[in-house]
């Protein structure tokens, strides 16, 4: 539908509108509208990045017609970025999928057939047949799911429960493996608990911002607006930016540094050395709250075991470490002198020293921010550990304005992938499948027979690709992501497995993405406020929203899909007799009965829904499904530092930062006076560790898996741009965003282009050892690579950037390094 100019102006001029439970409206903007055509407003977190901005969603006649920044939201305070302004339009692309589609020929499934509309019953029939066949012939390791940091909390929870408890397979992993896994392992190694200790309120209280591999100006623009305000309104505030190329965040930088890829490890160790050599260690903090350990080195690059680099590694995949003394640590970092670090990194000495002084100054509060530059790194866990070292040496942590802060890229990479535990090795609340006690807790809360959850870690994202290609993973469900475009090494390691006749691939998506078109079965999915949902953002803020419109056609939420699919399996289909013998009352029941319609999940009746409140899933199943799942999930974390508030509390507020104890959220963890888990007199307690102490790790600089050589003479890096989000499957369907940045380009230094007789605007072939892509030369614009490096975003489905990238991963986190491989260029 089209809005009249009068309605458009009314919808966008007000700071907030409509009296909805939990939303307060400033008196000045409570303008009455005609009841017959009034826009109804309700709150929701933004659908895009991990900042977690609050928006007001305006609906009219069953459609979303407007959105605006929520002035009551503490994250964004009424602001939106350019993507947030166009949220309504992501819902209504002309090619929106509205019914299941199966590859068919002559009325039957055929992997080489054409996509044909079918019913949900038929879709689940063939899906169940393929999953049951794989389970019967090869067991739980033959099935898998690739989920998302964009799934709602209960969608992720239901998926993990279905696979780990129902199918007894840990082969479920989220696309957050590609972006946040190194941060997770880094947090766990250093602190014993995941996620940042600080919050966004640090921005207004700090003296210095240091960005490590993070272009916040484009990737986290609302937070960047707050940083900009802090910097420009306070002359004593400093901004330092480190990256492998110049980008828009450099425009605000007092100290902008471009370093050679992978050498951030050396810079981090140099800063630690500078702190020690200049007597800037916070002795009182360090002595009481820190342990030291030496990590194993030469750990490989997460490639296939047959790869020469893996064969050559002395300790492939090892996360082992041993205690060390301060004197030993001092000697270790002493090797990273200013002169050596300049030689390795290419950063001028005066800039490195200025950065080190910033951290060492006891009068300066410092925040370190990072995203994919650290995490998508073959030593990403080490990079995370090393930046924690700096904050632990100086005691600049867990206090207002001070701390290390890992930013997230997806709206619920924290709340769903990490906190719920949709990784192949995790359970809710930082528990892991390899820990017998953790499995026992999960089995008790889920009312499962002892031994149901397998102890072996499942296949991570890249391992899933390899298993599909090798024919050992045969039934595969991809949900809420576009991994065929977003994952690495497409032609060699992913596409072959998807099109292998031994495998059956299901993709749940609202649009015909590259992934959907490569699948065998496409399930049309409800988006954003077409369902009730919850996200958890980067500052541990859990935010809820209500369903506000119905999904088009036969589209169904991912939660409905998971729960409904569970009805197709009896416990006898998936559990051995030794498990059934422990729970004879379960015989003959479906996984739906046991996992999703038990006495815990069904305890909240439909009467708890507000009158006329949309909630398609709950009304179909006959109970308040989301509330039942959330309260069951929350039981994992309450009482040991992961406390979530009661379900109903979140509908009344703009989110709460966990742990939430006695109704009060926590802004700064691990410090006395801020964290309810730190007792009086303790000052700090890193209670994720048994002794309450954080760990400083001695870890060296090690080179990248692939670097330029005589033939492939350029570094290649990929990432995002402001206007588009990830693979562009939503933003490229917004005409304004598409026009703003219609196609991917190759950013290159003018002298590198000239040396290859390439001119701006010309087409160019980018060639790696894995494939090639044609793009357009760009020697100007927002991104300015140094000589020897090129940068290309991956949002453009017509230019499959990740054909080029290497599937090397951090051996500890299994996260892919999208930032470093070698390419050469050729004229077209």
From Swiss-Prot:
Post-translational modification: Predicted to be exported by the Tat system. The position of the signal peptide cleavage has not been experimentally proven.
GO molecular function: 4 iron, 4 sulfur cluster binding; electron transfer activity; iron ion binding; molybdenum ion binding; molybdopterin cofactor binding; nitrate reductase (cytochrome) activity
Cofactor note: Binds 1 [4Fe-4S] cluster.
Positions contributing to [4Fe-4S] cluster binding: 46, 49, 53, 81
Location in or out of the cell: Periplasm
Gene Ontology, cellular component aspect: membrane; nitrate reductase complex; periplasmic space
EC number: 1.9.6.1
Chain sites annotated for binding Mo-bis(molybdopterin guanine dinucleotide): 83, 150, 175, 179, 212-219, 243-247, 262-264, 372, 376, 482, 508-509, 531, 558, 718-727, 802, 819
PROSITE patterns, per database record: 4FE4S_MOW_BIS_MGD (PS51669), MOLYBDOPTERIN_PROK_1 (PS00551), TAT (PS51318)
GO BP terms: cellular respiration; Mo-molybdopterin cofactor biosynthetic process; nitrate assimilation
Domain of life: Bacteria
Any matching Pfam family: Molydop_binding
Main location: periplasm
Reactions performed catalytically: 2 Fe(II)-[cytochrome] + nitrate + 2 H(+) = 2 Fe(III)-[cytochrome] + nitrite + H2O
Cofactor: [4Fe-4S] cluster; Mo-bis(molybdopterin guanine dinucleotide)
Keyword terms: 4Fe-4S, Electron transport, Iron, Iron-sulfur, Metal-binding, Molybdenum, Nitrate assimilation, Oxidoreductase, Periplasm, Signal, Transport
Gene3D superfamilies linked to this entry: 2.40.40.20, 3.30.200.210, 3.40.50.740, Dimethylsulfoxide Reductase, domain 2 (3.40.228.10)
EC class of the enzyme, as a word: oxidoreductase
Family membership noted in the UniProt record: Belongs to the prokaryotic molybdopterin-containing oxidoreductase family. NasA/NapA/NarB subfamily.
Biological function: Catalytic subunit of the periplasmic nitrate reductase complex NapAB. Receives electrons from NapB and catalyzes the reduction of nitrate to nitrite.
Name the record gives this protein: Periplasmic nitrate reductase
Organism of provenance: Pectobacterium atrosepticum (strain SCRI 1043 / ATCC BAA-672)
Lineage, highest ranks first: Bacteria, Pseudomonadati, Pseudomonadota, Gammaproteobacteria, Enterobacterales
Gene encoding the protein: napA
